[in-house]
Amino acid sequence: MAKNLMLWLVIAVVLMSIFQNFSANNINNRKIDYSTFLSDVNQDQVREVHISGREMNIIRKDNGRYITYIPISDPKLLDNLLVKNVKIIGAAPEEQSFFTAIFISWFPMLLLIGVWVFFMRQMQVGGGKGAMSFGKSKARMLPEDQVKITFSDVAGCDEAKEEVQELVEYLKEPSRFQKLGGKIPKGILMVGPPGTGKTLLAKAIAGEAKVPFFTISGSDFVEMFVGVGASRVRDMFEHSRKVAPCIIFIDEIDAVGRQRGAGLGGGHDEREQTLNQMLVEMDGFDGNEGIILIAATNRPDVLDPALLRPGRFDRQIFVALPDIRGREKIIQVHMKKVPLGNNVDPMIIARGTPGFSGADLANLVNEAALFAARNNRDVVMMSDFESAKDKITMGSERRSMVMTEKQKESTAYHEAGHVIVGRLVPEHDPAHKVTIIPRGRALGVTFFLPKDDVLSINKNKLESQISTLYGGRLAEEIIYGVNNVSTGAHNDIKVATNLARNMVTQWGFSKKLGPLLYSEEEGEIFLGRTVTKSKHMSDETARIIDEEVKLLVEKNYNRAKKILEENLDILHAMKDALIKYETINSRQIDDLMKRKSIQSSNICTDDDNN
């Protein structure tokens, strides 16, 4: 289409240039009246005259040129010119041919008609490839041999994989289900945090199903033209009916499926009209037998309730973050293309990466391979995975950043305060590593690693986290005094305050207020939430909440302070170790907490991960 349009533009430019040339022969000659010409002749200013019919091209003695026309027959003109010794040159008048005259007269109209016919033909071109095909669906149909991903490439989400495997089996062998009265699900909504493998599952379905597979993003429906979204939905389902049974996959459906009548735009914006059309196509008067709609989102809370009901999305599959066994399987899948050293153990890596999604683990393996290549190794060692994990969890090292000895000492005391309080309060995650090498925005980082996957947190553990967060600030206060505390604890204070407020207002950990919900998470109006907010508490209750939050923070603040004051010798020893080695691991932290000296700066051993 682009080539055809360019060809038409070139033809139009050429024809217009030809048209301009017909009338541009004498564009440099100005026209004057006949009386001025006679005056120039009488004043002996004319040197040469070219006569062609009634048109005369005059050349003055000063080389000036102009054109004039003889209004009537002037029998004395030639005599006057001869008297003034003007050179007279005669020429036959130029006459346009009949075809040239017709062309010049009709060319503009023919050009307009040609442009109109061109666009009308393009509007009739199917497949969404025409110049005016704004309403054509952008869904791409993937050939069976194009998608190479299968269920063997998907790991860490066994329950979700079983659900979609049943769907593929139905498409391959529908009679086995139909003889028992079972019907194929019309829609499946895959829900889960980012990076857990929702889109990968859809690709695996495409690789296993052996049926036409259409894929489109939720943002591809709505554009700047009114009515385009609804038209694209109709066109997509129309194409799907022709090749049923088939699968339609809509990625990030929250872009078009947000709740109607909420947020900005009221009930008449283009997105809502697109959603209305999708609701009708999914379960309206027109049957869609054999069309299975699969959608993925990480924001199910903003979707319209009508979109989620049975008959449209019959199933909701939650794709959760992988547990330790799932992480091990995911790591093994990504390690297939990486040459590994003998000391690499996927289970140890999985144990040290709680909370990592499938995408995070893929990035971890890739970063480890890059570290090995950077160090000119032929295989990827366990130390490369450790360095990659540190980079992902704590940020990249900024060794080029210049820190004074005073800043290093202050940072070392700050991080040591976190570690000591974290090791001595109950039920806190063990400290895995601490460093005073600047990473990301932080001057130092303390990394706590849970022993097991965290499914829920009790009150004691939450209070221990608050105490540990204030450990860094308190270490500075004890060593340097209240007036010399730095701003390094800004984020620690923010996190601790939010934890304490949530404990009081959302999790029911306040005896005075009881197990009641006093605040809800605020939703963004652009994500389907209302603009207005209602207040669920009185001013007196708000005052009590502030008091309870303050009491909770002060309680754990004082506990952390007492712990550090009782272990000042460990605080000084850990500061010295951090300044000497810059980074210490969990085994070295154990030695320091037992008041033992440490000799080695080795921070990447297999024993640490165990």
Swiss-Prot record:
Annotated membrane topology: Multi-pass membrane protein
Cofactor annotation comment: Binds 1 zinc ion per subunit.
Annotated GO CC locations: plasma membrane
Domain of life (superkingdom): Bacteria
Annotated GO biological process: protein catabolic process; proteolysis
SMART domains for this protein: AAA (SM00382)
Entry's EC annotation: 3.4.24.-
Localization (cell): Cell membrane
Positions of Zn(2+) binding: 414, 418, 492
Binding of ATP, residues: 192-199
Protein name as it appears in the record: ATP-dependent zinc metalloprotease FtsH
Biological source species: Buchnera aphidicola subsp. Baizongia pistaciae (strain Bp)
Gene this chain is encoded by: ftsH
